[in-house]
Structure formats: C-alpha cells, structure tokens
C-alpha cells in the first residue's frame, strides 16, 4: 500500500522524500516497481483509462454511478465499488454544488393560480405536466437570465429562452417556443412559482389562447417546484459552476451545448436516473415505439 502511494504522488514529491516520510528503502520501492503487474492491477489500469475518458468527455460532470453505468453499457466490467475506489485514489470528483440565491419575486398584487401539482411531479403521458422557472448566469459583461420549460414525462427540456433582462417577455418566449416544438398541445398543466413574470397578464394570456392550465407553488414553498429546482441544480453544477464567461455569447453557447447537445440528446452519456439511466429523448422514443 505504501509503494502504491509513492506512484500516485511522484509528481509532488521525490522518491527520497517519500522513502524518508514512510520509513521504507529506495531499493525496496524500485524492486516493487519492477515487478510485473497482477491481472487485477492490469484490469484496473485499463478501467482507469476508461474512467478518465468518460470523466473528461463529460467535463468532470459525472460521478461514479453514471460512469459505471455508462461503461457497463459499453460492455466493460465496471462495478460501482471499483469505479468509486479508482476515482477516489486519483482525486477525481464530480463537480460540486454551489449555493445560489433565489430569483423569484413573489411580492406583488398580481393574480395567482392554485397549486394543482401539489408536489406530484409524475406524468403518465407526454404533455400532461410541464414545469418552468428562471435561473441566472453571471458573465463579465453582466447577468443573463434563462427561462426553461421542462416536460415531466420524459424530463426533457422542451425549450428555453435567454435574455439580459428578467421580464415577462422572457417566460412568454420560452412557453411559446415549447408549444411550437410540441405541436400546440391542449390541456397541459404548466406549473411555476409565483414570480411576477409568471403572474403577468401577457404570460397568463397565453394560457387562454392555447387552452393551457396554470398552476403555481404556494408562496415560500421551497418544494413546490422541486422538479424544476432539481434541473436548475444539475445545470448550475454541470454547466456553470467553475466556469468563467468573458462574454454573454460565451455563456449562451454553454447553455445551448448543455441543453441541446448534452442533456437532451446524448443517449448514454446523459444518464438520467429517474428514466432508468437513458436520455430524455431516448426515453420518449422508446415509449412511442
């Protein structure tokens, strides 16, 4: 075990320093290093290459569950336990969460809708329940605001809109684009918080025009839009945290890449636990077939 620690830390300390710290001889270390690798060690080295490949391809986003599942789907022996150990030994950790303050402004006198979902975020068929929210992204040029519409049956991001201002026009654009992409479905429950943008006359007018049903979380209820908050959390951790955007254009490209290329479409790479570890689009395609 001590000799293995040497190998993992050679880039930080000289062999002489590590020998003194761990009270072992140089000759003993070099003798250990010259031995042929066991079958297990050789297998671990090959697995390590695959783990690093997946980890780098997904920009440090996935943890051990998604990496092990993806490698298993590729036909490679990659138990969760082995992946955890190898990632830990090499200091590879999925991107960690960072706290972000809320953007919702519920202090207004606009009409609000009742909470029809009541934390039931399961949908039995497509276009039965949608959820929406606004999140924000900092760039060196200032803030960007992202409005997302999420389909609860497949957890697919139906559509989204992004702007320098957090206005009613932003959420209206996201909803209109979602309607067009889904071929104008009727009777969809569209759930959001009680922010002034969602309570605006312009946004609520779309519900009348397109025969949608408005639903809103209760004021101060942090679980009222939990499915959307969960998506926001994943987005911030996997696409935003640790990134520095010099321009708004850089951030917009990152948003597009995450939603349209990574989250919605990549079959195995975006392993969604609630969908049996397949992508939202693959889940929908299987159900239709």
Pin down the residues of each PLM region.
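Charged DNA-binding/catalytic regions of mobile-element recombinases
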Residues: 1-289
